[in-house]
Amino acid sequence: MKKQSYIIALLAGLFALASCQDGNWDIPEGIPYGNNDLKAGTTVTIAELQSTYASVISSDNYKQITEDLWLRCVVNGNDYGDNLYKQLSVQDGTGGIIIGINGSDQGAFMPVGQKLLINLKDLYIGGYGNMAQIGGLYNGGLGRMELTEWKQHVRLIMDNMPEAQAFGTMKVDTIDFDPNKTMAQQCGRVVRLSGVTIARDGTPVIAPDDGSVSLVSNCVNRTLSGGNAGKKCVLRTSTYASFKGVTIPTTPVELYGIATIYRGTWQILARTQSDLTWVK
């Protein structure tokens, strides 16, 4: 399925290239994903957005964004490794946030480092386990927005476009995980954990699906201890992740991932196998 998606993305890229046969090789007529007609209005940062809706987020409620607000951000995590299920993680210079999208293989179009311009008006923001998330309504609560809706609200910004200048030096960066930081300070960011030990319950691989460990929504939560993990931190991995069978070392390791939190427990989501630094 993922291979097919990348073939589609490649063909889409060739289509965009073909549209430049009039001599303008720098800027294609349009990118075959998202809404190329979007033009930014009043912009807001992720920190400002989370501050404005802080009470909604902390109470696990939700609210529709009715103002014409725009967000400039960059993708720092996607579903390429099949561990961020129907989720996109983005950041700007002030923080990070998770976006729920009811669509698969979005990493084929929005790789890590891709700049996005998002029209927030009419989307929903709220809390899931006290963590901020942007999405849509599902069964009367906050969930994932439909893919068709997402594509109407997002524009992919390439570095050779004039619009890219407004992003300044925005890029994906990594911060050291700190268990004492708040949700707004750390969630949706790429974090580094050093000198941590991963629990080896059951079959000692990252996410066994053989019944040897308990699953929560088809995910394995492995306790992280030592190093900078703090007291309530787990490595959360889907049993569908492409790296689910990686063996867990018996010694402390360094690992990376997207920081999320659920009701006071930090959950680290490795994006791909490369986030597990002991794998060569």
Regions from the language model: what does each represent?
Residues 21-85, 89-115, 119-280:
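OB-fold nucleic-acid-binding modules
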Residues 1-8:
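Bacterial N-terminal signal peptides that target proteins for export
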Residues 16-19:
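C-terminal motif of bacterial Sec signal peptides marking the signal peptidase cleavage site
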